[in-house]
Amino acid sequence: MEIRLSEIAQFLGCAIEGDGEAPIRGIAPLHQAQASELSFYTNRKYAAQARLSKAGAIIVGAKDREQFAGRRLLISDNPYRDFARVVDRWFNRSYRPAPGVHPTAIVGDDVQIAENCSIGAYCVIEDGVTIKAHTVLFPFCYVGAKTILGEHCLLYPRVTLLERVRIGHRVILHPGVVIGGDGFGFAPDPPQGYFKVPQVGWVEIADDVEVQCNTAIDRGALGPTRIGQGSKIDNLVQVGHNVEIGEHSIIVSQVGISGSSKIGNWVTLAGQVGLVGHIRIGDGAVITAQSGVAKDVPPKAIMTGSPVQPMMENRRALAELNRLRELRKKVRELERRLTVLEQVESC
């Protein structure tokens, strides 16, 4: 495939610097790109790498254009996004199977499968399921009774949707995702042990959500567990029963969210964050990696640590800890001098 740089610029709505007729035959990171390949630059950490790059053209922000004088450039207000748009438009190699239901798939009664859907080998679709247009189920997926799948969804192999799950449009679920399993609900019943609390709720996943490998989203005990429009959930995340995640939030790998916690819009939970149950995280908040959250977090706060605290407070506390060794030396010296004085006075 060969595309003129001017075609890419027109598609993106970007200004060009340099020869717009230059051919682009591929995409690559800065340090690997060759003369016919397109790359992008957003992070000044890689400035030296960018200057040495052999890329045929680079997508850059307006504030960075001067350091690339003489290079072929596309000037963008969001270089990373626009690079992704180019990849999606011309270089996306994602495999999509042909429409149809594989003969080994098991389809229950009263199932509605719309046009142009693809149901892969050994999928199991229980009674009363609705699958809307252009949705793809790769092999070995399970869809529980009365589940609804929206249009243009993509379920990779071994995705499990238990009963009464509701999935919006353009949702992507990666291998091993389990949605709608029982929440962790057990009533103490001594001396016998615990009585299992029936989990009779469901899960609602809004449009444009992506959930990556081996993540579990539990059904509500009563009522729904909800994931808001456009939110992205990484690998190995646990979402407890009746959790609500707002729109366009980012949940990074190995996060654990306990039951009934409410997470706002545009929130970021970095890797291995843990949340206790029944707390609220305000819109736009950021929780840094490995933080432990046991209380509500206000909107737009940046929090860190375990227990979690505002980032600046945490940095001051760490600075004080780093001074303790020197302080300990001073205290020991004072103790030594005091001992000498006491010995002198006793003579």
Swiss-Prot record:
**Catalysed reactions listed for this entry:** a UDP-3-O-[(3R)-3-hydroxyacyl]-alpha-D-glucosamine + a (3R)-hydroxyacyl-[ACP] = a UDP-2-N,3-O-bis[(3R)-3-hydroxyacyl]-alpha-D-glucosamine + holo-[ACP] + H(+)
Q: Give the source species.
A: Nitrosococcus oceani (strain ATCC 19707 / BCRC 17464 / JCM 30415 / NCIMB 11848 / C-107)
* Taxonomic lineage from the root: Bacteria, Pseudomonadati, Pseudomonadota, Gammaproteobacteria, Chromatiales
Pathway recorded for this protein: Bacterial outer membrane biogenesis; LPS lipid A biosynthesis
Task: Give the PROSITE patterns listed for this entry.
Answer: HEXAPEP_TRANSFERASES (PS00101)
Instruction: Please report the name of this protein according to its UniProt entry.
Output: UDP-3-O-acylglucosamine N-acyltransferase
Q: Which residues form a coiled coil?
A: none
Which Pfam family, just one, is annotated for this protein? Answer: Hexapep
Briefly state the protein's biological role: Catalyzes the N-acylation of UDP-3-O-acylglucosamine using 3-hydroxyacyl-ACP as the acyl donor. Is involved in the biosynthesis of lipid A, a phosphorylated glycolipid that anchors the lipopolysaccharide to the outer membrane of the cell.
* Any one GO MF annotation of this record: N-acyltransferase activity
Supply the gene name.
Answer: lpxD
